[in-house]
């Protein structure tokens, strides 16, 4: 049996401020740092170990992974970073307060932008200072590859391309894998693994920094999945609460 661990980064500064984040490279809040330490302690207490780790090129996911691996005495394992594991790109909404945006555009419109799978938010323009084309971490990308906005389908497409080219072969070779990433990235993976419908993924919420374990067969089909706490597996349908750590 193959085990895969997925973890959404700890609370970020913009999670705390209720802002659309997307590809903006904000760091963890103090609470997020604590959540990451707790996740590492949970995995260590439950006897988990890893051979390789995958993450995005955004510091909130990278730092979460660093902290988790440090808590597990696994800081030495290989870590692969790729933009294809970045959060969904929220276009011109990035940096805006979610409540203020709802007042401006209406709650229904903002809900559609956030939760529908195939509707993109308003795009950035190429002269917008938030456009990432000049960011050195994306220098290998061609202009057309760098998004100006994304819907969940767009995010899923790039995430699954990386899954099939890099992560799935690693799992099939017998390596123990952890992925530290973002809410919509993990939603995309869960949708694929569990073969969720569009309606099913719309209501799916991924909590910050709670280890989500998938048990997979040799063909990487899911047998079952569950969240982990200090006391072990959490009953299906329940999400453990964070403790001060």
From Swiss-Prot:
Q: Does the keyword Isomerase apply?
A: yes
Record field: catalytic activity:
(2R)-2-phosphoglycerate = (2R)-3-phosphoglycerate
Family matches, as InterPro entries? His_Pase_superF_clade-1 (IPR013078), His_PPase_superfam (IPR029033), PG/BPGM_mutase_AS (IPR001345), Phosphogly_mut1 (IPR005952)
Keywords (A to Z) from UniProt: Gluconeogenesis, Glycolysis, Isomerase
Q: Where is this site: Transition state stabilizer?
A: 182
Annotated active site residues, numbered on this chain, are 9 (tele-phosphohistidine intermediate), 87 (proton donor/acceptor)
GO BP terms: gluconeogenesis; glycolytic process
Q: Write down the SMART domains for this protein, in alphabetical order.
A: PGAM
**PROSITE patterns referenced in this protein's UniProt entry, alphabetically:** PG_MUTASE
Question: Is Isomerase one of the keywords?
Answer: yes
- Can you name one GO molecular function term for this protein? phosphoglycerate mutase activity
- Read off the Pfam families from this record: His_Phos_1
Where do the annotations place substrate binding? 8-15, 21-22, 60, 87-90, 98, 114-115, 183-184
Class of the enzyme per the UniProt entry, highest EC level: isomerase
Q: According to its UniProt record, in which pathway does this protein act?
A: Carbohydrate degradation; glycolysis; pyruvate from D-glyceraldehyde 3-phosphate: step 3/5
Enzyme Commission number(s) of this protein: 5.4.2.11
Q: Which HAMAP family match?
A: PGAM_GpmA
The family assignment reads: Belongs to the phosphoglycerate mutase family. BPG-dependent PGAM subfamily.
What function does this protein fulfil?
Catalyzes the interconversion of 2-phosphoglycerate and 3-phosphoglycerate.
Q: What is this protein called?
A: 2,3-bisphosphoglycerate-dependent phosphoglycerate mutase 1
Query: Per UniProt, what is the name of the gene that codes for the protein in this document?
Result: gpmA1
């Amino acid at each position: 049996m193959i085990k895969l661990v997925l973890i959404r980064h700890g609370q970020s500064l913009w999670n705390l401020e209720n802002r659309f984040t997307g590809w903006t490279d904000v760091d963890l809040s103090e609470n997020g740092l604590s959540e990451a330490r707790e996740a590492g302690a949970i995995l260590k207490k439950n006897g988990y170990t890893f051979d390789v780790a995958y993450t995005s090129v955004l510091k909130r996911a990278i730092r979460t992974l660093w902290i988790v691996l440090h808590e597990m005495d696994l800081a030495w394992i290989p870590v692969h970073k790729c933009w294809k594991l970045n959060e969904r790109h929220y276009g011109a909404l990035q940096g805006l307060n979610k409540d203020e945006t709802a007042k401006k555009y209406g709650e229904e419109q903002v809900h559609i932008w956030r939760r529908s799978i195939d509707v993109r938010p308003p795009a950035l323009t190429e002269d917008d200072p938030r456009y990432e084309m000049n960011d050195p971490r994306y220098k290998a990308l061609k202009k057309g590859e760098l998004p100006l906005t994304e819907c969940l389908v767009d995010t899923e497409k790039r995430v699954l391309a990386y899954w099939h080219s890099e992560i799935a072969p690693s799992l099939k070779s017998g390596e123990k894998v952890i992925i530290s990433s973002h809410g919509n990235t993990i939603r995309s993976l869960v949708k694929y693994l569990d073969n969720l419908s569009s309606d099913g993924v719309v209501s799916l919420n991924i909590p910050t920094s709670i280890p989500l374990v998938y048990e997979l067969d040799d063909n990487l089909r899911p047998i079952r999945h569950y969240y982990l706490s200090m006391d072990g597996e959490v009953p299906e349908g329940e999400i453990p609460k964070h403790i001060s750590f």
